[in-house]
């Protein structure tokens, strides 16, 4: 992965309420979003619905707001659970970064101090550009603390740090 990722935004798939926010096996819309990112020379796609970020093509987007809280999309709005976030959330909070689900509106994203994305296949990555627009200051406090927490989990876990380098 590059030091700082770039993203494009794509329309999120429409799921009925029973399926929304669950890992149900129909990955094609996510694969299509990933392909669109690559076609547009971006690293990832962010899925948008009603002017809000609800998920990533293969990751959970998280932003550090000007209020000091880290926000991630809510499951009830279509985000999928993040195993990576669950692994590091308590440690982030213990290190002074409260983590909360939120409606990640475009205005919230645009005022973010920083953004990262988390995924079991990518670890912790810094996100610095969305649709050609710079977002916050990449590789700042959120990235550094999240990466430190993630590397600690990996070093005491079943996967090797080398798997993510």
Where are these regions (language model features)?
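Helix-start/capping segments and mature chain N-termini
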Residues: 1-165
């Amino acid at each position: 992965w590059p030091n700082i990722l770039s993203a494009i935004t794509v329309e999120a798939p429409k799921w009925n309420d029973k399926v929304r926010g669950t890992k149900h096996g129909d990955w094609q819309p996510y694969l299509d979003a990933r392909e669109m990112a690559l076609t547009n020379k971006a690293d990832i796609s962010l899925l948008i619905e009603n002017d809000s970020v609800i998920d990533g093509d293969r990751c959970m987007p998280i932003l550090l707001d000007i209020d000091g809280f880290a926000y991630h999309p809510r499951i009830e709005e279509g985000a999928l659970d993040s195993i990576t976030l669950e692994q590091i959330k308590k440690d982030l909070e213990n290190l002074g970064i409260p983590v909360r689900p939120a409606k990640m509106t475009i205005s919230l994203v645009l005022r973010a101090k920083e953004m990262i994305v988390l995924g079991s296949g990518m670890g912790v990555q810094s996100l610095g550009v969305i649709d050609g627009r710079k977002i916050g200051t990449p590789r700042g406090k959120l990235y550094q603390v999240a990466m430190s927490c993630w590397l600690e989990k990996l070093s005491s876990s079943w996967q090797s740090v080398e798997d993510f380098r």
